[in-house]
């Protein structure tokens, strides 16, 4: 959520920056009208309440003097009815303003490239050499199915499309990657491990920005009004909702493994085969709470931490700076890390690393004090995938495949695979 005082003072500047996002600003235009109306109602209400207090004192004085106060009592009742009407009107205006504020996306940082589509994203750096195969590389879903380490067909029978059973070496590879990533981030990168709940309430989904705008993308348990988490970012960020932290506690860095659940509404026809776009998938998420002046330095560190996973796995990748039109609702700046997938003959996203500045912190009321008696101010929050497990499995299968269909296990994973060197 944006700072309403900043928005009020810089309306045209914010409007211009949101236009760079390609946003429909029809609702945004209502802000000034609603904000003005709210402030007018507050003034009117306070004036009437002040008048009511004065009349109440006059009535008390007349009663003490045994004088007739009936006219003033009637006047006070009329004032009370007016206050009641204004309070109801104010409540409606504030609810409309709250809905509007929750629907306005974050302002892009000045370093975010201006553009309309993914074609305008900027390559920041590349790492690793793309392997040249002397045979036609297979897609990961064929490799995994032929090896018997996944079963899409039976998962479809048990649940539906875009689910998978991992089996044997496939299940162990998934588990190995989870352990490897958590060990790396906690032992070398300084994160604290968290195992979060997989269900959250509406306040949590609103705090991180999934609600109200993206409810159709989430799985709702209607009987409880809980949501299955689309990412561990939601429960982990909301761990500190409605809290005031001390400056000494910052930065806070969490690494959380979880399953993630997404309806992928509107993605029919895209990545319908394989592990790239599943309704349920595993991910290690990195979440940070930092001082505002440190957040962009922490974004670079966060991105480097996610990159380190791919470097140790020796998987070629590139880092993209996302343009304003491809930034996402909550981010002020975002990097996508894209891993090379031979069967696609291109790079595909495996991690997004974002700085939300104070956007989520305002929604979730997460603040800190610089000094013990200082006024609380919003923290800056960041998060990134470190990494998406299924997509990492896909990248390993495709980049480490041999002509006979076997898979060389990356050296760094072999201790987690019981010393095995090949999946066959």
Swiss-Prot record:
Catalytic reactions on record: tRNA(Ser) + L-serine + ATP = L-seryl-tRNA(Ser) + AMP + diphosphate + H(+); tRNA(Sec) + L-serine + ATP = L-seryl-tRNA(Sec) + AMP + diphosphate + H(+)
Biochemical pathway: Aminoacyl-tRNA biosynthesis; selenocysteinyl-tRNA(Sec) biosynthesis; L-seryl-tRNA(Sec) from L-serine and tRNA(Sec): step 1/1
Positions annotated to bind ATP: 262-264, 349-352
UniProt keywords, alphabetically: Aminoacyl-tRNA synthetase, ATP-binding, Cytoplasm, Ligase, Nucleotide-binding, Protein biosynthesis
Role summary: Catalyzes the attachment of serine to tRNA(Ser). Is also able to aminoacylate tRNA(Sec) with serine, to form the misacylated tRNA L-seryl-tRNA(Sec), which will be further converted into selenocysteinyl-tRNA(Sec).
Assigned protein family: Belongs to the class-II aminoacyl-tRNA synthetase family. Type-1 seryl-tRNA synthetase subfamily.
Name listed for the protein in its UniProt record: Serine--tRNA ligase
Origin organism lineage: Bacteria, Bacillati, Bacillota, Bacilli, Bacillales
Gene: serS
